């Protein structure tokens, strides 16, 4: 089994910096480190797993793009209402997903 290539969305934030450092420590390949204004759709072909720590307003688009490319997804973004999270989780259920936001 090969090591998955990570796509980190929200790389310039506090958690993004922490995740980049952890990936380096663990020698995990980061295929793309993105932030607001970067092209997630273009970066998806470079990696296997999307880790999203961006803004809650971007979560739906991140899920839609990730599902369309059949990539695994980790969502750490916070600020979603219970109703939003329920709808987004149903959409994300089409691919392997871990939702770690509160």
Q: What is each PLM-predicted segment?
A:
Residues 2-6:
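Extreme N-terminal starter segment of soluble prokaryotic enzymes
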Residues 50-51, 55:
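N-terminal Rossmann-like NAD(P) cofactor-binding module of classical short-chain dehydrogenase/reductase
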Residues 63-64, 68-69, 77-100:
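Rossmann-fold NAD(P)-binding glycine/threonine-rich loop
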């Amino acid at each position: 089994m090969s090591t998955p290539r990570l796509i980190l969305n929200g790389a310039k934030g506090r958690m993004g910096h922490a995740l980049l450092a952890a990936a380096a420590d663990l020698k995990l390949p980061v295929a793309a480190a993105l932030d607001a204004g970067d092209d997630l759709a273009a970066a998806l072909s470079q990696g296997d797993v999307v880790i999203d720590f961006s803004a809650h307003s971007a979560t739906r688009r991140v899920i839609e793009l990730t599902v369309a490319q059949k990539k695994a997804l980790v969502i750490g973004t916070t600020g979603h209402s219970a109703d939003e999270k329920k709808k987004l989780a149903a959409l994300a259920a089409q691919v392997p997903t871990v939702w770690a936001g509160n």
